[in-house]
Every structure is written in C-alpha cells, then in structure tokens.
Design a protein with these regions (language model features):
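Alpha-helical membrane-associated segments of multi-pass integral membrane proteins
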Residues: 9, 13, 97-148
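Cytoplasmic membrane-interface regions of multi-pass membrane proteins
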Residues: 24-39, 83-101, 141-150
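Membrane-helix interface and helix-disruption motif detector
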Residues: 1-8, 57-74, 92-96, 111-127
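N-terminal signal-anchor/start-transfer transmembrane helix
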Residues: 5-31
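Small-residue-rich segments of transmembrane alpha-helices in multi-pass membrane proteins
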Residues: 45-51, 98-113, 154-161
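Canonical alpha-helical transmembrane segments
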Residues: 19-27, 49-64, 78-91
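Short, highly charged, low-complexity non-transmembrane loops/tails of multi-pass membrane proteins
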Residues: 140-165
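Membrane-helix boundary elements
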Residues: 32-68
Length: 165
C-alpha cells in the first residue's frame, strides 16, 4: 500500500501537468460545457473549489502516510484554510488575475519540489496554481450580466470562451 501511495505522490505532479496541457485553451465539447457552467453558476464554482480541496486532502494524506514531516502539517493546514469557500475563491481569483503572483507560486512550487522533505508543500502550491488557471476571471464573470448577451446564448458562450483565460 505504501509503495502505491508513494507512486501516486510522485506521479501526481506529472498527471496534473499532463491534464493542464491537454485541456488549456482547448475547445472540446466538455471544456465548453465546463467553461459555461463555471461562468454562469456559483454552485459549479463552489463544487470546483471543493473538488480541488478534496484532491489536496487526498495528496496530503498520501504524503502523511509515506513521509510524515513538518511540511505535510503546513500544507494540510493551508488545505484546511481553503475549505472556507470565500478564501478558496479569492485565492483562485487572485492567482488567476495576477500573472506574476501565479508565476511566483509556480516557481516556489518548483523550489519546494527540489528541496528534500518539501514535496507536500510543492504539491499544494502546484495544485492551487493549476486550479487557478481553470477558474473564471472577473472579466468573464462580469460578461454574463450584460443585458444584450442574455438574449443570444451562443454568442455569450463564444464570448465566454474567448475571454475565459
């Protein structure tokens, strides 16, 4: 069991990176539906945030079982802070809107990945950074309230897709 959890822990970053490159700026049917629901429904954004936190809890558990250390405690506490919907939403918006902060978070994630015993912190920062990319921007959330866009949903979807990232 521990070998399997160790494999999950080390493969997680690469799987997340693969998913990122396969889905980023792609106009697949399910990605259009994902972008539409994330832009239009608060419940979809809440579900997305909770699924990210659930994924972080699982990864922290894997890190705790395979290599418990202080970094696991810190990343677990930060994950528990993200259980608050408002904090998670503001974190995703902040990282999505400010590209320099997003890049600094990714850079810090790579530094933590290179340091011994900081793997769980690296996984936390990397997951939050990738999750922030797929969270809708403030511009997209403001587009949905235009009165002329409400009359034509296909044009609204095209506008959302064009401005999502």
């Amino acid at each position: 069991m521990i070998q399997f959890l160790t494999l999950i822990r080390f493969a997680f970053s690469f799987l997340l990176l693969t998913a990122f490159f396969c889905l980023y700026r792609k106009e697949y049917g399910f990605m259009k539906q994902f972008m539409w629901k994330m832009a239009m429904f608060q419940s979809a954004r809440n579900l997305y945030a909770y699924l990210v936190v659930l994924m972080l809890i699982f990864i922290n558990w894997c890190c705790h079982v395979t290599a418990p250390n202080l970094s696991v405690v810190v990343s677990t506490l930060l994950t528990l802070v993200l259980l608050n919907r408002r904090i998670a939403e503001s974190t995703f918006h902040l990282l999505h809107e400010r590209k320099r902060l997003w890049f600094a978070t990714l850079l810090l994630s790579m530094v933590c990945y290179a340091l011994p015993y900081m793997n769980s912190m690296s996984l936390f920062l990397f997951t939050v950074s990738v999750a922030a990319v797929f969270y809708p921007s403030e511009k997209v959330l403001s587009i949905k309230s235009h009165p002329e866009a409400i009359n034509n949903p296909k044009e609204l979807l095209a506008l959302i897709i064009r401005n999502y990232y």
